[in-house]
Design a protein with these regions (language model features):
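Conserved C-terminal RecA-like helicase domain
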Residues: 94, 98-176, 204, 209-215
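Conserved interdomain linker/interface between the two RecA-like ATPase lobes of SF2 helicase motors
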Residues: 12-111, 151, 155
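Short regulatory helix/loop adjacent to the ATP-binding pocket of P-loop NTPases
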Residues: 25-36, 182, 187-192, 225
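Conserved segment of the helicase C-terminal RecA-like domain
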Residues: 12-14, 189-238
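Short, conserved "post-DEAD/DEAH" coupling segment immediately C-terminal to helicase motif II
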Residues: 1-13
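Loop/turn-to-beta-strand initiation segments
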Residues: 10-16, 88-91, 149, 173-176, ...
Length: 238
């Protein structure tokens, strides 16, 4: 019998693997007491599925105007990459809690204008389980958007409502879910296409708009990942 690598070293071997994206892997390694040769940082292309990233710029400095201009491209991206013959889930990240609610309403407004008010709903509205879950939703606006296939999350909704949204989204009944950037580490859902609507948030402490931390962007992009279901993934960065 040959010796294993762990039996030939003088100190115990410890492996710490992180599935979240980091911008300071070397600092984390030093904090854990590892020297640089024992810290491994994998490139973004080392992921279970190939990812196509699409970037669209907006030359508008006024935040509200820029977000308003992004509504139609977000809707179009859902239709284009979310699929028509084979609808696939779309996860949309927005800068704020208020924006998550308003964007959900905007998506339904555009669907209604296209004459397909429930194009994002992929379950029989009369299905007993679906009706029961909708009746349990406490937020009235959320209940109305879910009935048409669009859910949204933010820190203000109840834990029960959040679980219902995640359940309907993961089952495929609801195709679209809008989430504020601040919750990107809290959710447990993934999608075929991730759309990042703007890359700045308002810092209330200093009353300025700041760019998203690169770690947050990488984490949001990483949620376009369903290796057991899809063969590839898409991300749209606005």
């Amino acid at each position: 019998s040959g010796s294993t690598p762990t039996s030939t070293v003088s100190s115990p071997v410890r492996i710490v693997a992180l599935s979240s994206s980091l911008t300071n892997a070397r600092d984390i390694g030093q904090w854990l007491g590892c020297h640089s040769q024992a810290t491994f940082n994998f490139a973004p292309n080392c992921r279970p599925l190939p990812l196509e990233l699409f970037i669209q710029g907006f030359n508008l400095s006024h935040t509200a105007s820029r977000l308003a201009a992004m509504v139609r491209p977000v809707y179009s991206a859902i239709l284009r990459y979310g699929g028509k013959l084979r609808p696939r889930p779309a996860l949309v990240f927005v800068p704020s809690r208020r924006q998550s609610r308003s964007t959900a309403v905007d998506m339904l407004t555009m669907a209604h204008a296209d004459g397909q008010a429930k194009r994002f709903l992929h379950i029989n509205p009369q299905e007993a389980t679906f009706v029961k879950l909708l009746d349990a939703v406490q937020d009235q606006t959320l209940k109305e958007t879910l009935a048409c296939g669009v859910g949204f999350l933010h820190e203000g909704i109840s834990k029960k409502d959040m679980l219902i949204v995640e359940q309907l989204f993961e089952s495929g009944a609801v195709q679209v879910c809008i989430v504020p950037r601040s919750m990107c580490y809290q959710i447990s859902i993934s999608a075929y296409v991730v759309i990042i609507m703007d890359t700045q948030y308002y810092n209330g402490k200093y009353h300025v708009y700041e760019d998203y931390p690169i770690g947050d962007v990488l984490h949001m992009v990483g949620l376009a990942n369903r290796p057991s279901v899809d063969e590839d993934a898409k991300c749209v960065l606005l």
